[in-house]
A protein has these predicted regions:
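Beta-sheet repeat architectures centered on beta-propellers
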Residues: 1-80, 90-104, 228-244, 250-485
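Beta-propeller and closely related beta-pinwheel folds
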Residues: 37-49, 82-93, 124-284
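Conserved beta-strand positions in repeat-built beta-propeller and related beta-rich domains
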Residues: 65-68, 108-112, 148-151, 202-204, ...
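Hydrophobic or amphipathic alpha-helical targeting/insertion segments
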Residues: 96-130
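Generic structural signal for short, solvent-exposed loop/turn connectors between secondary structure elements
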Residues: 118-137, 196-200, 205, 383-390, ...
């Protein structure tokens, strides 16, 4: 079997150790799994969504919040409308909402012009400005403090400043009182990301710093554990905690482990990404983790996306493999699924057959971590029918130093209970300087063979899969040598 190996678009197609195309799939330890499309969840906001966040109340109820340029919204779990719970905000094109939870308080920020907003679970029905708090691009919770970075207050903006609340008090920000304070981090550019936990991680354009609590009088120490290198794209950060922080720099994709940055895209996808990125729209990049599939995803506008995000780069951090998906969206986010009843299912579809997510899915049970996306000003979940997948093998040479004829291909794609639709194309060329010519797509017959025919010296096989399937592993070919040319 010729496997669908690791997707390595930065390497040569000929004898590539992996796959040359892996589109609309999730990388697995062996082969690939389907990538789900979008399922519409909410009604529309006023403008495109710039952030989605979900948390649970003490009784288990899922609370979902979202924000656009001028408003914050709360999802109504009965009719899935987006109810405005605060308005009058000012966000420029490069700003997204950032949310954190501290005790029963949900805190939102992201603008240079608007003070942090607070919502007390079980008490409040709207967000309100937190008195004395700054406006901030980035938020996190570090130990017993709400921490902000890249802040604006008292009519001044401090791009390299970290400021935090009083200890165990998200509503109190008086500097010098109850350990509330700030710290400027010099000579490292703007702060572009902030991650909380037992210690904090401050990502900057030219450095990464650890924020460690030490108590009075210093409160926190800031140690630059990495200098001369940092995160250059403010909306490209997602984490599983301070020891597993994913981000994008000018030289590619990295994971920070709490002490150092490890390249995860070098000689794999970095060149592909920067060649594909619409560089004039980098402010539309977003990043989120899908814990169910153990992947981190970067949504971005490609050169064919007219400045809007239309592609997602997918990294499986468990097996350290990549893939890509074509998915139009506004923003990516990690959230929770609300619980559904028979009545609320009617708001998703007028019939069971019209539901894009299987009724067997835990999506309907509620409370599970879920990858979400904004599209058409609405919240969507990434739980729909599988997108049409395209996988392509490495380029191989069946007959050394001579032409060969491919007479048929057997794809190894598994399925549980339904039969997916599959077609196969063979791409062939006689010289490495030529572009491959692909045969007409041929369907799988009853003999488990796709009778595709193509001649050349170098071949690759493309498999197109639609419908419901489980794993795509690789292919076998029926090839015979021909005379030298």
């Amino acid at each position: 079997m010729i496997p669908f190996g690791e997707w390595l678009p930065d390497q040569s197609d000929f004898q590539n150790p992996g796959a040359t195309i892996a589109t609309n799939v999730i990388p697995a330890a062996r082969g690939y799994r389907p990538f789900a499309g979008l399922t519409e969840l909410s009604a529309a906001a006023t403008d495109r969504l710039r952030g989605i966040y979900a948390t649970k109340a003490s009784d288990g109820t899922v609370l979902t919040f979202a924000g656009d340029q001028g408003k914050l919204y709360k999802l109504d779990n009965s009719d899935f409308s987006l109810d405005s719970v605060a308005s009058g905000f000012t966000m420029t094109s490069d700003m997204n909402w950032d949310f954190v939870r501290f005790g029963d308080e949900v805190i939102a920020g992201g603008s240079d012009a608007d003070t942090l907003q607070g919502f007390t679970i079980g008490t409040d029905s709207t967000f309100s400005a937190i008195s004395g708090a700054p406006a901030a691009r980035h938020l996190a919770v570090v130990r017993d403090f709400v921490v902000t970075a890249n802040v604006t207050y008292s009519s001044n903006t401090y791009r390299s400043r970290v400021r935090w609340s009083q200890i165990n008090d998200a509503a109190s920000w008086t500097l010098g009182s109850a350990q509330a304070d700030f710290q400027d981090i010099a000579d490292a550019g703007d702060i572009t990301g902030l991650v909380g936990g037992e210690f904090g991680v401050v990502l900057m354009e030219k450095a990464i710093a650890r924020m460690q609590y030490v108590g009075s009088p210093l409160i926190f120490t800031f140690e630059k554990v990495e200098t001369g290198h940092g995160c250059n794209y403010p909306n490209s950060v997602a984490s599983l905690g301070p020891t597993q922080v994913f981000y994008l720099a000018d030289d590619g994709f990295f994971m920070f482990d709490g002490q150092r940055s490890i390249p995860i895209g070098s000689e794999k996808v970095d060149r592909f990404f920067f060649d594909d990125l619409a560089i004039g729209s980098v402010d539309r990049i977003s990043c989120a983790i899908d814990p169910e599939n153990q992947v981190v995803m970067w949504g971005y506008p490609s050169l064919s996306g007219a400045g809007n995000p239309d592609r997602v780069l997918i990294y499986n951090y468990a097996v350290q493999r990549w893939s890509v998906a074509d998915l139009e969206h506004e923003v990516l986010a990690s959230s929770l699924t609300p619980a559904f009843s028979v009545e609320t299912l009617d708001t998703l579809s007028s019939s069971l057959d019209g539901l894009t997510t299987s009724l067997d899915s835990r999506f309907y049970a509620g409370g599970f971590f879920q990858l979400s996306a904004g599209k058409d000003k609405k919240i969507h979940t990434v739980t729909g029918a599988p997108l049409d997948a395209v996988l392509e093998t490495t380029e191989f040479e069946p007959a050394t130093m001579r032409q060969s004829l491919i007479r048929g291909v057997t794809p190894y794609v598994t399925s549980r209970s339904t039969t997916p639709t599959m077609t196969v194309q063979v791409g062939s060329r006689s010289r490495q300087i030529d572009s491959p010519s692909f045969s007409t797509a041929v369907s799988l017959n009853d003999d488990n063979n796709c009778p595709a025919r193509s001649s050349g010296r170098y071949h690759r096989v493309r498999v197109n899969v639609s419908g419901t399937w489980r794993y795509a592993l690789g292919i076998d070919v029926d090839a015979v040598g021909m005379g030298k040319r």
